[in-house]
Amino acid sequence: MNPLTQFNKILILPLLIALSLIVVAPARATPSCGMLPPVTLALGHYPSGLLNLMCNEFDSYGWNLKMMVKGDSDVYVIQNTFPAGAHSGWHTHPGPSLITVTSGTLTVYDAADPTCTPKIYRAGDSFTDIGCGDVHLVRNEGSETAVNIVVQIIPKGAPRRIDMPAPGNCPLITCP
């Protein structure tokens, strides 16, 4: 057998496997279900270095701030509306999010939690999402519409949200 032909066969098999994974992986992703389209309330663009912030003037109160961002960033302010039963689908973000529930109750499932214990947030509660590959799902398990406001810091031009497959350690959450 020609060594070049054998070499091409060796290269083609991994290429075909990789291509099949690229085609199949999105089919396993879990898009949102029942949510209203997100509303962008504001979008700001920050050049590299502008989000390098430090404040330790209030250390006497037990508070200081350090934030260092390398590269240009987009900062979004988003409103998400979850009718009863709606969920975000499993997803991640390329950067951190600061979330405040403004009405209703939301339940958050975190894939990194081995027991996938749900965390419940009510109107007035705030929580963070580190993003950067942290896979989670937000669901309205109540009977009234829930709304949250999210501030996201992400690399300039990156998608705000990346759909992910459902993790094996969490309950199966389907679209009602």
What are these regions (language model features)?
Residues N2-L13:
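Bacterial N-terminal signal peptides that target proteins for export
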Residues I12-I22:
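Bacterial N-terminal signal peptides
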Residues P26-D74, T117-I120, P165-P176:
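A short, N-terminal "cap"/entry segment at the start of jelly-roll beta-barrel domains
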Residues K70-P94:
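Short, surface-exposed binding/anchoring microloops in extracellular/periplasmic proteins
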Residues R122, G131-P159:
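Ligand-binding loop in jelly-roll beta-barrel domains
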